[in-house]
A protein has these predicted regions:
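General nucleic-acid-binding
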Residues: 1-9
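Short, cationic-aromatic polyanion-contact patches
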Residues: 27-36, 52, 85-107
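A short, conserved structural fragment
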Residues: 75-85
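Short, hydrophobic-biased segments on the C-terminal half of alpha helices
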Residues: 71-72
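Short helix-to-turn junction characteristic of helix-turn-helix DNA-binding domains
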Residues: 42-46
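Short acidic, hydrophobic short linear motifs in intrinsically disordered regions
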Residues: 47-58
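Short coil turns linking two alpha-helices in DNA-binding domains
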Residues: 27-28, 63-68
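Short alpha-helical segments that sit at the start of domains
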Residues: 10-39
Length: 114
């Protein structure tokens, strides 16, 4: 991507604000401070592993409240799915294109650091 000519700081701020107000898929997901930590933890779970919010919180090193705050986002973006008729509610990593792409991105990033 080529560098664009210098912009006026106010224009750059307006562009940034516009992106934040209408985020693309990646920004929509990662604009939340704890979501990358949750996704990183989810990507290290064994396939098919079911978990509660408390178990995910312990695995990720965050509070249960943090997991509760972002559960709807993780469900909405097909990263996790709820196990029907589970009590307490249980979740698992979704078998979705989003998760597949996250695994591939994670692997590529890990490989680039070797």
């Amino acid at each position: 991507m080529s560098e664009s000519p210098s912009k006026h700081p106010a224009v750059e701020k307006d562009t940034k604000e516009a992106r934040l107000e209408n985020p693309s898929g990646v920004l929509y997901l990662f604009q939340h401070e704890s979501v990358p930590i949750l996704i990183d933890a989810i990507l290290t779970l064994p396939p098919g592993r079911e978990f509660t919010k408390t178990e995910l919180a312990d695995h990720a090193g965050v509070t249960r409240q943090t997991v509760s705050k972002y559960t709807d986002l993780l469900l909405e973006t097909d990263i996790v799915e709820e196990i029907p008729n589970s009590s307490p509610r249980r979740y698992r990593v979704a078998k979705s294109t989003v998760v597949q792409e996250l695994f591939e991105l994670n692997s590529a990033l890990n490989a680039s650091g070797e």
